Amino acid sequence: MKKIVFTGGGTVGHVTLNLLLMPKFIEDGWEVHYIGDKRGIEHQEILKSGLDVTFHSIATGKLRRYFSWQNMLDVFKVGWGIVQSLFIMLRLRPQTLFSKGGFVSVPPVIAARVSGVPVFIHESDLSMGLANKIAYKFATKMYSTFEQASSLAKVEHVGAVTKVSDKNTPEPDELVDIQTHFNPKLPTVLFVGGSAGARVFNQLVTDHKKELTERYNIINLTGDSSLNELRQNLFRVDYVTDLYQPLMELADIVVTRGGANTIFELLAIAKLHVIVPLGREASRGDQIENAAYFVKKGYAEDLQESDLTLDSLEEKLSHLLSHKEDYQAKMKASKELKSLADFYQLLKKDLS
């Protein structure tokens, strides 16, 4: 039986594509393994998925771009992670390794290359993260969502591979219940914060619940079950799975962070959106770059977190609603998307 090893983690964005690809390989008779951190979100997501995947936990250290005494300790953690990954590779002898990035992916990528296993990696953002900059040196090929510099000879630009489609999905019973609490005469706004970025949206909705629900139906994906609530013009929930795309479709506008996975999902369904990127103090600035790219293309409006107030947000919402046709026309004309089926076929071809 052919074997494939996946790696990637730290945030949901570094796991999502793996979760989409693994069932495809399982259906085609591959034995699927995953290398990550058992304390990380990658392990939680795989357990939640119920997929027949063998998880191997390794030591991992954070890769920092700044001086910290912890860097010394983390060098040893990464080194031990490489040794652990090398033993896993030599024991499994897989046909390939597919990496979605994140700090935990560096040891398996290095170990795969050392043991002669082909390495394929995927980069979602406009500029490479530090983990993928290191991984690129050991990669057989990198697939990119955005076009990269021509000097990167091993990069193939494939566009965004998303988990949503422009086809309407069946309405779950839960969605019908939510809609009975909404006013059909008001626009519906969905706040999506991702695994690490929901806090500022949660605070905004909490602080201005009365004003927001007088003018909009509000859906708030919080990541915090203590905030769960369903009442007139308001639905707050910590986490959704089957409801994810139906809620996207229900919304007139989405307010989101600038992670590539989410904004390309919105592009795929031509959904109006305001991007509030994580700032440089909380990230390497990749979300700011992604947001600027989408604004330049005419797909979205952006708003820096430091400028986020009820008034500034409403100004952006009003602008999008009054220019809805222009934004949607540009999104529908985009050539920057690839279906999961097409990407899977491309990946299988490259593996052969």
UniProtKB/Swiss-Prot annotation:
Disulfide bonds: none
Enzyme's top EC category: transferase
GO cellular component, one term: plasma membrane
Compartment(s) where it occurs, according to its Swiss-Prot or TrEMBL record: Cell membrane
Membrane-topology annotation of the record: Peripheral membrane protein
Transmembrane segments: none
Family that this chain belongs to: Belongs to the glycosyltransferase 28 family. MurG subfamily.
Pfam families assigned to the protein according to its UniProt record, in alphabetical order: Glyco_tran_28_C, Glyco_transf_28
InterPro entries with a match to the protein in the record: GlcNAc_MurG, Glyco_trans_28_C, GlycoTrans_28_N
Record protein name field: UDP-N-acetylglucosamine--N-acetylmuramyl-(pentapeptide) pyrophosphoryl-undecaprenol N-acetylglucosamine transferase
